[in-house]
């Protein structure tokens, strides 16, 4: 009976070790595929339009800020008939970024205090 128990433990150990190695191989393959996809995406990415620059030709080309993508906002200037479009950050997103930044700084202070 002891022999069967010892053999069973050895079998389970070998099985778990081999499955762990297989999972590591799969994870490495997934990482390699993901990196190649990211490189392809970066290669085909076009230049973004900075904040407050004209985005009338491509309204989806605005750059990202720290957390959110800027939005192409169009308006008619006072006394003008031509529509003007610029990349801008909506105020509510601006306030959310400020709050997130302050929370991050406060979290760093708490971490520093309590080590």
From Swiss-Prot:
Residues 1-20 form the signal peptide. Residues 21-44 form a propeptide. Its main location: secreted. It is found in: Secreted. Transmembrane segments: none annotated. GO terms for cellular component: extracellular region. GO terms for molecular function: toxin activity. Disulfide bonds join 48-63, 55-72, 62-87, 74-85. The presence of a 'disulfide through disulfide knot' structurally defines this protein as a knottin. Belongs to the neurotoxin 19 (CSTX) family. 01 subfamily. This is U3-lycotoxin-Ls1b. It comes from Lycosa singoriensis (Wolf spider).
């Amino acid at each position: 009976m002891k022999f069967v128990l010892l053999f069973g433990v050895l079998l389970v150990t070998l099985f778990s070790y081999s499955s762990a190695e297989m999972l590591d191989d799969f994870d490495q393959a997934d990482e390699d595929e993901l990196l190649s996809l990211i490189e392809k995406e970066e290669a085909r990415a076009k230049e973004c339009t900075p904040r407050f620059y004209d985005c009338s030709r491509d309204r989806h080309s605005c750059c990202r800020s720290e957390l959110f993508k800027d939005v192409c906002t169009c308006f008619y200037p006072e006394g003008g008939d031509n529509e003007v479009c610029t990349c801008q950050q909506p105020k509510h997103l601006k306030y959310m970024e400020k709050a997130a930044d302050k929370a991050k700084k406060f979290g760093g202070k708490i971490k520093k205090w309590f080590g």
